[in-house]
Amino acid sequence: MPRRRVVGTRKILPDPKFGSEVLAKFVNVVMVDGKKSIAEKIVYGALEAAASKSGKVALDLFEVALENIRPSVEVKSRRVGGSTYQVPVEVRPSRRNALAMRWLVEASRKRGEKSMALRLAGELVDASDNKGSAVKKREDVHRMADANKAFAHYRW
């Protein structure tokens, strides 16, 4: 353990359009090579497209989609004796958000639509309806944790 002081977490500024800190964080997740203005165009374009496609308010749609993707449990590898067990552990709230955002962006990048904004919009609409690749990823993680419930006593 280092003897220096513990560095506090940075406060993220809310995004300028909707005033949401979660959305500002999401823009940072979408961003590639430090190109934030392009990431903002993609996210805001996706929100507009998703809102027009589903007929819901953009920010509410985003919140519902994230809520449907957030995992509650995950598995972590734990070495005991000579074998490695997949131990189910609960996910911290900050990590839940981070994983949900990451999975949403990964699923969007694998889609077939023309632009990233349209891919993201499609994935947002699917996630808000509890379908799509990102929701499938969450279900897979939950299924994995459920299958390894027997090793839950190895938690640390």
UniProtKB/Swiss-Prot annotation:
Keywords: Ribonucleoprotein, Ribosomal protein, RNA-binding, rRNA-binding, tRNA-binding. InterPro entries: Ribosomal_uS7 (IPR000235), Ribosomal_uS7_bac/org-type (IPR005717), Ribosomal_uS7_CS (IPR020606), Ribosomal_uS7_dom (IPR023798), Ribosomal_uS7_dom_sf (IPR036823). One of its GO terms (biological process) is translation. Pfam families: Ribosomal_S7. It comes from the Bacteria. One of its GO terms (molecular function) is rRNA binding. SUPFAM superfamilies: Ribosomal protein S7. GO terms for cellular component: small ribosomal subunit. One of the primary rRNA binding proteins, it binds directly to 16S rRNA where it nucleates assembly of the head domain of the 30S subunit. Is located at the subunit interface close to the decoding center, probably blocks exit of the E-site tRNA. Part of the 30S ribosomal subunit. Contacts proteins S9 and S11. Belongs to the universal ribosomal protein uS7 family. This is Small ribosomal subunit protein uS7. The lineage of its organism: Bacteria, Pseudomonadati, Pseudomonadota, Gammaproteobacteria, Alteromonadales. The gene is rpsG.
